[in-house]
Amino acid sequence: MRLLLALLVLAAAPPQARAASHWCYQIQVKPSNYTCLEPDEWEGSCQNNRQSPVNIVTAKTQLDPNLGRFSFSGYNMKHQWVVQNNGHTVMVLLENKPSIAGGGLSTRYQATQLHLHWSRAMDRGSEHSFDGERFAMEMHIVHEKEKGLSGNASQNQFAEDEIAVLAFMVEDGSKNVNFQPLVEALSDIPRPNMNTTMKEGVSLFDLLPEEESLRHYFRYLGSLTTPTCDEKVVWTVFQKPIQLHRDQILAFSQKLFYDDQQKVNMTDNVRPVQSLGQRQVFRSGAPGLLLAQPLPTLLAPVLACLTVGFLR
C-alpha cells in the first residue's frame, strides 16, 4: 500500500519536480540528452527579488563619497594556483587567502576563489552590463568575511554582505601575457571535476587592470549568480575592463566542456540579467571618474556652446 501511494505521489508531481535537480545554463538545455534545471527553474533563493547580475544604468547611479580606495593584502604574491573545471566554469582556488578591506566595506574579507563567465561572442559573455552593453567575459574574485570579524556567526550567516565579490569586465584587445598561465592550464582540465596546477606563478594583481583604475567602481547589494543564489553579496563592479586577445578569450569555449563526453562546449555560462527593483547602484567618489565616452566626444557640446557665445 505504501509503495502504491509513493508511486501516485511521484506521478502527480510536476515535471520540474521529477527532473534532475542539477542546475545548468540555457545553452545546456538544447542538447536533447541533457536534463537539468534551466535559469528560470533554478531553486533556492533564485526567484527572489534581490538577485544578480543587473544592468547598471550609469546615469542613475548615485555618488557615494564613502566608496574610497581598497586596501589589498596578498594580491601581489605570485602563486602557482590550482585550477579546476567544476562543470559550470573554470575556478582558481586561492589557497593563500589574499584579502581586501576599505572600499566602503564593513570589515576585511578573505579571497577564496576566482572564476569567469564567457561566450564565443565578444559582446555576450559578461553577466553584468553597463547601459545595456555586455562584454566578452566577466571575472569574479569571491571573498568571505574573515572569521572572528563578523560578530555572532549564527546571526551573521544571513547578513546581506557576508560575501564580497570583485567583478571585472573583460574585453577583446591585445594579448595579456599575465593571463597566459591560466589559459594554458585549460588544456589539462577539459572535463568536469578535473584539476591542474598553473605551470607559472601568477599574482592577483597580474590579472587586474592597473591599480590606479581600481578607484573607479559601482556598488550594490545582490546575490550569487549561481544556485542557490543566496542574497548575501556586496558587489563591486569595476569600470575599467581587463583586456585579453580574442584567441585567449575563445580558448575558454574551445578547451572546456560541460560534460564528461566532451560533446557540449562550456560557453555562454551566463545568468540572464535580473531586475534591479528598488535597489540603488552607487558609484565610487574617487576624483577623476573614468569617462564612459572619449574626451573629445564629451567636450564637443561644450565647445559648440562657447563658440556660439563668442560669435554673439
From Swiss-Prot:
It catalyses: hydrogencarbonate + H(+) = CO2 + H2O. Zn(2+) binds at H115, H117, H140. Interacts with SLC4A4. Its cofactor is Zn(2+). Residues 1-18 form the signal peptide. It is a lipid-anchor; GPI-anchor. The active site is at H88 (proton donor/acceptor). Transmembrane segments: none annotated. Disulfide bonds join C24-C36, C46-C229. Glycans are attached at N33, N152, N195, N265. Substrate binds at T225, T226. It is found in: Cell membrane. This is Carbonic anhydrase 4. Its EC number is 4.2.1.1. The keyword Signal applies. Belongs to the alpha-carbonic anhydrase family. The keyword Lyase applies. Catalyzes the reversible hydration of carbon dioxide into bicarbonate and protons and thus is essential to maintaining intracellular and extracellular pH. May stimulate the sodium/bicarbonate transporter activity of SLC4A4 that acts in pH homeostasis. It is essential for acid overload removal from the retina and retina epithelium, and acid release in the choriocapillaris in the choroid. Residues 285-312 form a propeptide. Residues 21-285 form the Alpha-carbonic anhydrase domain. It is an enzyme of class 4 (lyase). Its main location: membrane. GO terms for cellular component: plasma membrane; side of membrane. Keywords: Cell membrane, Disulfide bond, Glycoprotein, GPI-anchor, Lipoprotein, Lyase, Membrane, Metal-binding, Signal, Zinc.
